[in-house]
Curated annotation (Swiss-Prot):
Keyword annotations of the record: Amidation, Flight, Hormone, Neuropeptide, Pyrrolidone carboxylic acid, Secreted
Residue positions, PTM Tryptophan amide: W8
A Gene Ontology biological process term: neuropeptide signaling pathway
Family of the protein in this entry: Belongs to the AKH/HRTH/RPCH family.
Tree of life domain: Eukaryota
Subcellular locations according to the entry: Secreted
Keyword Secreted: yes
Protein name as catalogued: Adipokinetic hormone
InterPro entries: Adipokinetic_hormone_CS
Residues recorded as bearing Pyrrolidone carboxylic acid in the entry: Q1
GO CC list: extracellular region
Organism expressing this protein natively: Namaquaphasma ookiepense
GO molecular function, one term: hormone activity
């Protein structure tokens, strides 16, 4: 499981 949280 890959979680990507952008900062925008």
């Amino acid at each position: 499981q890959v979680n990507f949280t952008p900062g925008w």
